[in-house]
Design a protein with these regions (language model features):
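Post-Walker A helix-loop "phosphate-sensing" segment adjacent to the P-loop in P-loop NTPases
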Residues: 79-89, 119-120
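A short, basic N-terminal segment
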Residues: 1-57
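Short glycine-rich substrate-engagement loop in P-loop NTPases that contacts/grips substrate
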Residues: 101-136, 155-160
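Walker A/P-loop nucleotide-binding motif
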Residues: 53-75
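Residue-level preference for the first positions of well-ordered beta-strands
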Residues: 56-60, 95, 145
């Protein structure tokens, strides 16, 4: 039996597993940090420590498809975004990640955000009520960072709808 010295130590036990288990292992998500990704993680982490102000900074990350943007977001959430209960027994969700709606629709964006809080809502509720619920949840759960993935979906549709959604994000 070989000691598999050519295999990274952490992965040596995998070599002894069945073919099915090794293939499953190969298909699992794995984080491989690289300088640009680590820089982005550091920048996002910095946002978590900023004091509140009327217009908080924002960040738009652009790159070609399948370049790892969502993987970076998921890694950031894994490191810093998990919810917890604070000293006052209040639930805290420091980071909320939502998928942008497939079209620039303010109501759909609010529903996507509310869904992440597991808050009940009715699809037929007026936009103003959904907006109120979103703002309430963001404050209640002390959200420091709202990440909207696949923002390019919001660039479809008429310029008026795009502006409406962009104003909602502000």
């Amino acid at each position: 039996m070989s000691n598999y010295s050519h295999v990274f130590q952490e992965f040596r036990p995998i070599v002894e597993q069945s073919n099915e288990d090794r293939l499953y292992f190969l298909e699992e998500d794995r984080w491989i940090g690289y300088p640009a990704a680590n820089d982005l993680l550091d920048q996002l982490k910095g946002f978590l420590t900023l004091p509140k102000r009327s217009r908080m900074p924002n960040l738009l990350v652009l790159s070609k498809p399948n370049n790892g943007k969502t993987s970076i977001i998921n890694q950031f959430f894994k490191l810093y975004g998990e919810g917890y209960v604070n000293a006052e027994n209040n639930a805290v969700k420091p980071v909320i990640i939502v998928q942008a709606p497939v079209s620039p629709d303010e109501k759909a964006l609010y529903m996507a955000i509310l869904d992440k809080f597991w808050v009940p809502f009715r699809e037929r509720d007026p936009v103003a009520k959904l907006r109120y619920q979103v703002v309430h949840c963001l404050k209640l759960y002390e959200v420091k960072l709202l990440i909207i993935d696949e923002m390019n979906s919001l660039l479809c549709g008429s310029p008026i709808k795009q502006r409406t959604v962009m104003n909602a994000i502000k």
